[in-house]
Amino acid sequence: MLVKTLFIFLITFFACSEFLLGTSLIQRPIILAPLVGLVFGQLELGIVMGATLELAFIGAVSIGAYIPPDMISGTILGTALAIQAGTGPETALALGLPISTVMLALNSVLSAPIMLVFTHLMDKDIEDGN
C-alpha cells in the first residue's frame, strides 16, 4: 500500500506541476484517472472513471475571474476511493465533484493569507530598495 501511495503522490505532483513544466493537460481527468487505475491494477475501470469525470469537468476552464473546481484532487481521490471501495464510475463522480469543490474553497481560503504576507514582505523590500 505504501508503494501505491508513493505512485499516487508522484502522479499528483506531476499533475500539479503545470506552472513548472508547462501545460501538458495531464491534469485532465481523462489522463489522471487511468494512471490512478493503473497504480491500483484496474486500468479499464480507471479509463471509464476518467471518461465519466471528464464529462463532468469538460467546461471547467479558467476564463476571466472564474476559478474552476480543483480537478486534480477530485479526480485522484474520487477514482482512488471508488476503486478501493470496489464500485464503479458513479461513485467516482459522486465523490469527485464535492471533493473538487471543497478543495477549491480550501485553496482560496488558505492561499489568500499566505499571498497577503508575501505581498507585505515585497512592499517592504521595495521601500528598502532591495
Functional labels for PLM-detected ranges:
Residues 1-73:
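Hydrophobic transmembrane alpha-helices
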Residues 15-19, 41, 82, 86, ...:
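Membrane-water interface at transmembrane helix exits
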Residues 94-130:
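Helix-loop-helix junctions within the multi-pass membrane cores of secondary transporters/permeases
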Residues 57-101:
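Long, highly hydrophobic alpha-helical transmembrane signal-anchor segments
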Residues 1, 88-92, 130:
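Alpha-helix capping and helix-coil boundary motifs
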